[in-house]
Amino acid sequence: MKIIAFHASRAAAPKRRRRRRRNYRPLLVLAIFLLIICAIGFAIHQVFSQTDTDENRYPITYVGSLPVHEHFVSEDAIGRPGGTREIEYVVIHETDNFAAGANAARHDAFIQENAKVEKLSWHYTVDDHEAYHHIPDNEPAYHAGDGMEPNGGNTSGIGVELCVAEDNDYEKTLQNGALLAGYLLWKYDLNMDALKKHQDFSGKICLEHLINEHRW
């Protein structure tokens, strides 16, 4: 009887151990889930928050593979109205400048000079390989043609200009613009309804390419 009891107890032991292991499984699953969430958060941070400095000493943020050069217009420029606002829209434009070499860097040089004396500004310019950031996202700018209308394109929208120069790859520019716009919608917790055309605020046929080709 003792031998039988001994074998019975040995046979029962693994079952008890298996039951104990099963009880730990929910904790193990939770730990793995938390590790995955942390990994995703770290990956998002790495993809959207990498910074560097270019040869002109402008800070660079990478939105995916797109380098975004931060070169803000002077705070005392007429084209930088200042103040902060609630961001409600991402407003897409085309530069309407078809001259060869009219890329994002050239438009950055243009806005730096012209915003000093004109009510003229927007937040980003994008071409087929890079982007420039001219006005902080949380400040209004003069890009939508609707003055300082409350909840309008200027007061509540981030203006993004897409380059259309003859030597610029427009399709690649569209891809880069979509990448930047998607990031801005994500960053400011906006839905797709917040993605607007310049035309939506002033009636101007802009973005001319996409509107005339019935792509938007």
What are these regions (language model features)?
Residues 1-25:
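N-terminal Lys/Arg-rich, disordered targeting/topogenic segments
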Residues 2, 21-65, 84, 163-216:
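Basic/polar, cationic surfaces and motifs that engage anionic cell-wall
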Residues 5-6, 52-53, 71:
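Generic early N-terminus positional signal peaking at residue ~5-7
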Residues 56-188:
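Active-site-adjacent loop/helix surface patches within enzyme catalytic domains
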